[in-house]
């Protein structure tokens, strides 16, 4: 109903942002439509209008409906003069950026824990992707809220006076950890099919626990940043990554009596690569905590700085 779509609900900081029009060709691929929807959502627009030449196709409607379900938050979808209108894109009582980022962190830790070599279920790859979709949606929400914070009126209280880009950086690191957790689960299942010996299983499980604990510790630091603790965490991250580089040979040496099958070598390589990336992204979070702690230090040149340096660059 056009009247409902016209009214709608919006986050206070979205009201100064114009509705976003997505104009599609008649044969627009579903993947392209989905990317356009994500970009529109991240722009912090309060309303997305989808127009398609020749009228909305059934596959386009399905993509928009699926996207609405992904973002949740009570988002509504209506028809309006032949177009699709997606609105009410924000919760009525949105959480703060810190709360939202830590909720994302909890989801990522759950996913990473479930993906462990000894704990991963025999779920299909599609099931793991579905879990990762939840992580992606939370990361999108953080980015949307950061955009609202920058484009909307500055209404921060004293306790909120923090550079929101830090939460965006942390959420992106967490999103990538979630991606690698899925890869660990998928390739770990293939590795288990090669019937690894107990010593091999134990070594890989121990390193997975270390990577999981590292990310957990980085999130604790993000909530309570301290210079000394953050530096210690970064040193530990370097040591863990060095361990990952030597672990393949140690793991395969456990199969001393037989040459490991190619599937074992490839699967182990992928699992260890992803565990290395998990630690690297955890280091990014520790660096964000370190920057926050440094910014909070009293300065003889004025009030604490809200500038933020970037984390490790070039991660996959």
Q: Language model features by range: what are they?
A:
Residues 1-316:
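Cytosolic, long alpha-helical scaffolding segments
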